[in-house]
């Protein structure tokens, strides 16, 4: 079993890995020992691989989800679970299905903005368990991280695309 301060669990590599790496570096610079691991393909083994103080998870909507995440309490009874909420909008303004229900309201929740924070409060999350932080993936569009991404000209050359045409890019796990 690996002892870490922070375990960041990712679900979708294409969506979450870059921001998990960014978060890992930021936490390591503050002296934390951090591991990143994927929830799949060995979801059932994940809670037995790590002993952590903080567990950063991609989602926790209801008790069924918490049945899994709470398995981490077995080896880390004081672990703090933080829901990064990689999905904060469900496309339905009258009822956001990404808001926590049941026991998932008791953990910490990252909020990208005031609207989601209001939804968290309405769903019964304690205000002290809401972390307003913005979307981690957007940090790559702000200095000094903008230089990490390749610009349109470089991408056009690399993939033999016409830089003057509109592109439609599809993100997928590779």
How should these model regions be labeled?
Residues 162-174:
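Conserved donor-binding/catalytic core segment of Leloir-type glycosyltransferases
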Residues 1-2, 164:
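Short, surface-exposed loop and linker segments with low hydrophobicity and enrichment for Pro/Ser/Thr
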């Amino acid at each position: 079993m690996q002892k870490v301060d922070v375990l960041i669990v990712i679900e979708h590599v294409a969506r979450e890995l870059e921001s998990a790496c960014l978060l890992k570096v930021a936490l390591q610079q503050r002296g934390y020992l951090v591991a990143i691991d994927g929830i799949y393909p060995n979801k059932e083994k994940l809670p037995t691989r790590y002993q952590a103080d903080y567990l950063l998870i991609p989602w926790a909507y209801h008790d069924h989800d918490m049945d899994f995440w709470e398995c981490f309490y077995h080896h880390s009874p004081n672990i703090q679970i933080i829901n990064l909420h990689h999905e904060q909008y469900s496309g339905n303004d009258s009822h956001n299905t990404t808001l926590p229900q049941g026991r998932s309201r008791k953990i910490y929740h990252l909020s990208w903005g005031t609207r989601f924070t209001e939804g968290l409060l309405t769903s019964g999350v304690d205000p002290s368990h809401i972390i307003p932080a913005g979307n981690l993936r957007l940090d790559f569009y702000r200095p000094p991280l903008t230089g990490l991404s390749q610009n349109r000209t470089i991408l056009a050359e690399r993939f033999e695309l016409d830089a003057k045409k509109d592109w439609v890019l599809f993100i997928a796990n590779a």
